[in-house]
Amino acid sequence: MLELDLQLATEAPAPSEAQFREWCALALRQRTADSELTIRLVDEPEGRELNHTWRQKDYATNVLSFPADVPDELLDIPLLGDLVICVEVVEREAKEQGKELEAHWAHLVIHGCLHLLGYDHIDDDEAEEMETLEQTLLAELGHPDPYADDDAQKHSTVTIKDSE
């Protein structure tokens, strides 16, 4: 079971909750345990503020992932963490990169969920493993390879790990 808390902190149009559930469930299907996660959809000012606070970057990025650092045994449902998605950045990127908006949304949600599961793209081997899984999952949805034309977008999602 997936418990999804979808928070809308922007009035910009976004995919339906059913779409978010489908994309998350696909990315998390390798996980046998129940899972809880939050997706917060934000505008550019909030996206910029969070990116500045956590990464010292003064711009809004498309997706930030915040993996939970709470032992599963302390929770009724294992908390995976939070994704923060800047709607305006997602829309702009899709347009600039000539990508179908729904496909770009699906990619970024899947990419963020994989970060919450511990996948990363710090080195080439990790990146290849993560990207291959993303490509496979997106193909199941009928979406094209998101990395086919634009290597610069390969590693757009940032994982924030609490250093405390």
UniProtKB/Swiss-Prot annotation:
It is found in: Cytoplasm. InterPro entries: MetalPrtase_cat_dom_sf_prd, YbeY, YbeY_CS. Residues 155-164 have a biased composition (Polar residues). GO terms for biological process: rRNA processing. Coiled coil: none annotated. One of its GO terms (molecular function) is metalloendopeptidase activity. Its main location: cytoplasm. GO terms for cellular component: cytoplasm. Zn(2+) binds at H111, H115, H121. Its cofactor is Zn(2+). The keyword Cytoplasm applies. It comes from the Bacteria. Residues 140-164 are annotated as: Disordered. Pfam families: YbeY. Keywords: Cytoplasm, Endonuclease, Hydrolase, Metal-binding, Nuclease, Ribosome biogenesis, rRNA processing, Zinc. Binds 1 zinc ion. Belongs to the endoribonuclease YbeY family. HAMAP family: Endoribonucl_YbeY (MF_00009). NCBIfam families: rRNA maturation RNase YbeY. Single strand-specific metallo-endoribonuclease involved in late-stage 70S ribosome quality control and in maturation of the 3' terminus of the 16S rRNA. PANTHER family: ENDORIBONUCLEASE YBEY, CHLOROPLASTIC (PTHR46986:SF1). This is Endoribonuclease YbeY. The gene is ybeY.
